[in-house]
Amino acid sequence: MDGKRLLALASATAIGVALIVGSAVTSTTLASAAKIVDTAGSALHVARNGAPSSPEPLTGQVEARTFWSASLGRAMPYNIYLPPGYANGSRRYPTVYLLHGMAGSDRQWENLGIAQAADRLIAAGAIRPLIIVMPEGESAYWVDHATDGQKWGRYTAVDVVNDVDANFRSIARQRSRAIGGLSMGAHGALQLALNYPGEFTAVGAHSLVLRRFASAPSYFGTAADFAARDPMQLVKKTGPGGCSFAIWIDIGDGDPWASTARQFDGELTDLGINHQWHLWAGDHSAAYWSAHLEDYLRFYDASLSSRVPRSSLS
């Protein structure tokens, strides 16, 4: 319907209502009609300018970045979620590093819907705005390789973190930095938190995969090399209550890796290390991870401090 028809219809509607209820077309009626016409005109202006009828919630942005990794000696990509309002301010944010699984890439968490989940929770006030970093790890288990010299662990915990802190408004300290991962990435997140105890304040192991030495990739090296990369053996070295970071473990009851994840949960309990353990319905799949994205983000938010240190304000 064009503008003239819309305005004419609004006028006729006001006068028609008066006639139906048996009242005269008085100056009051005409004033009411004018009000309706004015409202219709405003609506027409909004429609013509393409503005939404109600404000849309703000959304974050996912950007792709490539940087030079000194540990790997080559350029490496990562994707980074910047929360709503990031582009228009100077605020600094806590950061979560999310590692993909064996068959995944730096796009896996984005494809699962992590950006949309963060947008929803931030808009609802359920979590604070945060930065999410999703690096590329190929199929390297996020560990320093014992056999070929590829330092995938250092690349993740040092190179990626330093690049983010240098180029984005992250809060560059342990209390405001968490790490997590799914499947192979869960193994990686745990061993990195244990091997770099001053870097992360929380670690999330989602659908945790813990390999035995006999089934580990060859780049894990000898039994002694394996022990330095195995979360089960690393956590034993911390001693009772020895972890300085929050730990979350979840896995589906139909996941083929559930039994070893249970063993890790038991080891933490025996050592007196506080942690969260969740056994949920589900398997080792994208459907399972997508269903729990908001649970993961709530855990990270609760573990992170968003207070900006005074030194970063100067």
Predicted regions: what they are:
Residues 3-314:
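Non-catalytic cap/lid and distal C-terminal segments of serine-dependent acyl enzymes
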